[in-house]
Curated annotation (Swiss-Prot):
SUPFAM superfamilies for the chain: Glycoside hydrolase/deacetylase
Keyword Lipid metabolism: yes
Protein name stated in the entry: Probable 4-deoxy-4-formamido-L-arabinose-phosphoundecaprenol deformylase ArnD
Phylogenetic placement of the source organism: Bacteria, Pseudomonadati, Pseudomonadota, Gammaproteobacteria, Enterobacterales
Top-rank EC class of the record's enzyme: hydrolase
Pathway: Glycolipid biosynthesis; 4-amino-4-deoxy-alpha-L-arabinose undecaprenyl phosphate biosynthesis; 4-amino-4-deoxy-alpha-L-arabinose undecaprenyl phosphate from UDP-4-deoxy-4-formamido-beta-L-arabinose and undecaprenyl phosphate: step 2/2; Bacterial outer membrane biogenesis; lipopolysaccharide biosynthesis
Catalysed reactions, semicolon-separated: 4-deoxy-4-formamido-alpha-L-arabinopyranosyl di-trans,octa-cis-undecaprenyl phosphate + H2O = 4-amino-4-deoxy-alpha-L-arabinopyranosyl di-trans,octa-cis-undecaprenyl phosphate + formate
Residues annotated as domain NodB homology: 2-260
Described purpose of this protein according to its UniProt entry: Catalyzes the deformylation of 4-deoxy-4-formamido-L-arabinose-phosphoundecaprenol to 4-amino-4-deoxy-L-arabinose-phosphoundecaprenol. The modified arabinose is attached to lipid A and is required for resistance to polymyxin and cationic antimicrobial peptides.
Similarity-based family: Belongs to the polysaccharide deacetylase family. ArnD deformylase subfamily.
Pfam families reported for this sequence: Polysacc_deac_1
EC assignment: 3.5.1.n3
Classification via InterPro entries: ArnD (IPR023557), Glyco_hydro/deAcase_b/a-brl (IPR011330), NODB_dom (IPR002509), Polysacc_deacetylase_ArnD (IPR050248)
Length: 299
């Protein structure tokens, strides 16, 4: 049996309102639990449109057929009008999710984090994280114990900024296996659970066709030599590609794969995890930098 952590990112108002309820129903039908990470502040995702001037981002949007994949309401959110508050508008859906699944913070403002966090000060990072955690805790009525950086935009500064919040784990980077981030010699931070597998929008195109994606990703899960963690998005697998995701759950079960919340991947003693660090890097299929796992020594 292969255990795979299932991470569900919720970036937008529509993803929360339409995608999450469908995912909850789908997961319930198949007896699967996952980790949901919510954006709870304003939905300004449409402001990413300026990135179309960047060739890699434009190619990604064309390759994934973004207009039909996400819908124009997502692609234009927060452009000509102020972005609506996601958490306030969908508190009931978020509370229901937290009743049945592990629930953590993705971002206060997904667009702001993905666009600006790379040059924010530690204080600005802490204030933004605090704003998101406070809002999410007010919605679900219990402490937030985990987080996942929006767009995997994380580095050593983000690791340090999250330390005051005493989270059980963070999932802020791409990598191969769980690790303890080294803050300074002799001091480690909150365990990191990296995403190890590509997302739909990173690979769909000439190399992998939509109709063969499930076969391809299951093969990758079975071949993963680390701790497999897979990310889906409420805006994609919860809406237009919900049937494809349901088919994935069936095929994965038949292949001996069990999906679980990320928290279930943590060992009883996190001190046993190897040391590592998060550095800025790049991966195929994704525009811009993102946090990547790198080995570190204790000295």
């Amino acid at each position: 049996m292969t255990k795979v952590g299932l991470r569900i990112d919720v970036d937008t108002l529509r993803g929360t309102r339409e995608g999450v309820p469908r995912l909850l129903a789908t997961l319930h039908r198949h007896g699967v639990q996952a980790s949901f990470f919510f954006s709870v502040g304003p939905d300004n995702m449409g402001r990413h449109l300026w990135r179309l001037i960047k060739p890699r981002f434009l190619w990604k949007m064309l390759r994934s057929n973004a207009a039909s994949l996400y819908g124009w309401d997502i692609l234009l959110a927060g452009t000509a009008w102020p972005g609506k508050n996601i958490g306030n508008a969908n508190a009931g859906i978020i509370r229901e999710t937290a009743t049945y699944h592990e629930t953590g913070l993705h971002a206060w403002d997904h667009h702001a984090w993905q666009t600006h966090s790379g040059h924010w000060s530690i204080r600005q990072l802490e204030e933004d994280i605090a704003r998101g955690i406070t809002a999410l805790e007010a919605i679900i009525g219990k402490p937030v114990t985990c987080s996942a950086a929006a767009g995997w935009r994380a580095d050593g500064r983000v690791v340090r900024a999250k330390e005051p919040f005493n989270l059980r784990y963070n999932s802020d980077c791409r990598g191969t296996t769980l690790f303890r981030p080294l803050l300074m010699p002799g001091q480690t931070g909150t365990p990191q659970i990296p995403v190890t597998l590509p997302t739909w929008d990173e690979v769909i195109g000439p190399a992998v066709q939509a109709q063969s994606f499930n076969t391809w990703i299951i093969s990758r899960m079975l071949q993963d030599k680390g701790t497999p963690v897979y990310t889906i998005h409420a805006e994609v697998e919860g809406i237009v590609h919900q049937p494809l995701f349901e088919d994935l759950l069936v095929r994965a079960r038949d292949a001996g794969i069990t999906f679980c919340p990320l928290g279930e991947l943590l060992p009883a003693s996190p001190e046993s995890l190897p040391l590592g660090q998060i550095v800025r890097g790049h991966i195929p299929g994704r525009e811009g930098w993102l946090g990547c796992q790198q080995a570190a020594s204790a000295s």
